[in-house]
Regions:
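Extended, non-catalytic scaffold segments that flank or surround catalytic motifs
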Residues: 34-52, 80, 106-112, 120, ...
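N-terminal positioning helix adjacent to the helix-turn-helix/winged-helix DNA-binding module
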Residues: 32, 36, 62-66, 127, ...
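Charged, amphipathic alpha-helical coiled-coil/dimerization segments
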Residues: 100-160
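Alpha-helical linker/hinge and terminal dimerization helices associated
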Residues: 40-43, 47, 54, 88, ...
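A cross-family signal for key residues in well-ordered alpha-helices
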Residues: 68-71, 86, 133, 159, ...
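DNA-binding alpha-helical recognition surfaces that contact promoter or target DNA
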Residues: 97
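N-terminal leader segment of winged-helix/HTH proteins
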Residues: 1-58
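N-terminal helix-turn-helix DNA-binding core of bacterial DNA-binding proteins
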Residues: 45, 49-94
Length: 172
């Protein structure tokens, strides 16, 4: 039986039978894409931790997940909970819990949709608007700092590439 030498990721030389080589090559197919997806997840977690630290340091009294809801409403109010859940990538049960907590804090309210009584539309309250005015400049500092360090050109390139990845994944 003829044997092949293959390099593993750790650069140690291993000897494999020909049928094993095919299996190893097949296992490695897609490894770069898998690593890319892991890095996207790690980056999101680093972003979450950074925002959590910023919120805590400024005594915001909300979680990153609550911030996601509020941030979405800062861009558009009067949207259904279903649309809001899709925009922040949360399931309905999780969003309901977040909404309950934000209502208790007085930052949001839900109103019946006049076109469909089964749906609730979500709005910021005056307290939610006031909170936005207080916390948004602090959050913007995080974005400005990161943008300054990374560079606009690099960010534009990464954004374009990630949009391509998104388009591919949506088609699969």
């Amino acid at each position: 039986m003829k044997l092949f030498k293959c390099l593993t990721n750790s650069t140690k030389i291993r000897i494999f039978a020909p049928e094993k080589v095919k299996t190893i090559i097949k296992m490695r197919e897609g490894a770069e894409f898998r690593e890319l997806m892991l890095q996207v997840v790690r980056t999101r977690m680093a972003f979450r931790r950074s925002m959590q630290r910023t919120l805590k340091k400024n005594n915001a009294g909300i979680t990153f997940e609550m911030l996601q809801v509020l941030s979405s409403l800062w861009h558009e109010q009067g949207i259904s909970q279903q649309i809001l859940a899709e925009r922040i990538a949360k399931d309905k049960a999780c969003l309901t819990n977040l909404m309950n907590n934000l209502e208790k804090k007085g930052y949001v309210c839900r109103k019946e949709d006049p076109n469909d009584r089964r749906n609730k539309l979500v709005f910021l309250t005056p307290a939610g608007e006031e909170f936005k005015e207080q916390i948004r400049p602090v959050l913007d500092q995080v974005y400005v700092y990161a943008e300054h360090i990374i560079g606009i050109e690099s960010i534009e390139t990464m954004l374009s590439e990630l949009n391509s990845v998104y388009d591919v994944l949506e088609k699969i």
